[in-house]
């Protein structure tokens, strides 16, 4: 944190002895939500919710119980939807949804049923609020489209020799295209 008055930075690091602090010092993504608080996705520490005004951390770690926590402690991408809920991309645990009103998680795992994410290693997320769609880039599973209203997934994969498909099944970033 930067202090404009002193010109100094204050570091926040993890401390195993401190239960209220950051769970891991390696932060892979940061999202500032519509309330001005920060959601920090960490490497093997899950998600940390940080209120900078009061310097309070809330930890969301991996859990064996779907409603209580993340499917994986490795969080690489996080986005907020128009309802203030979080969509969390994990490495190895697919896509996680956190409902801020009920404070419960829902996991979207690869291969779990017919309508699922194509791969568990999520590398990119993009939210289209007008269409209520989440675009999900994966490592080796191509591109996924999740219609939030219906819960339906569509998979877009590379097909060898077909130039009309993705050039690769590795999608690391997603940006909107404007005509």
Regions found by a protein language model. Give the residues of each.
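Carboxylate-rich, polar loop motifs that coordinate divalent cations or form catalytic acidic clusters
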Residues: 1-179
């Amino acid at each position: 944190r930067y202090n404009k008055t002193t010109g100094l930075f204050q570091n926040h690091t993890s401390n195993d002895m401190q239960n209220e602090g950051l769970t891991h010092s390696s932060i892979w993504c940061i999202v500032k939500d519509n309330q001005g608080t920060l959601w920090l996705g960490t490497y093997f520490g899950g998600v940390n919710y940080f209120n900078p005004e009061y310097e309070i951390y809330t930890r969301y770690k991996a859990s064996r119980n779907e409603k209580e926590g993340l499917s994986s402690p490795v969080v690489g991408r996080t986005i907020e939807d128009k309802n203030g809920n979080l969509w969390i991309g994990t490495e190895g645990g697919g896509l996680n949804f956190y409902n801020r009103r009920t404070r419960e998680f829902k996991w979207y795992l690869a291969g779990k049923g017919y309508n699922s994410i194509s791969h568990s290693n999520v590398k990119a997320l993009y939210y289209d609020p007008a269409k209520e769609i989440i675009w999900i880039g994966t490592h080796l599973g191509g591109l996924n489209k999740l219609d939030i209203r219906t819960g339906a997934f569509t998979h877009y994969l590379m097909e060898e020799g077909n130039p009309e498909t993705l050039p690769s099944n590795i999608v690391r970033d997603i940006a909107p295209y404007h005509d």
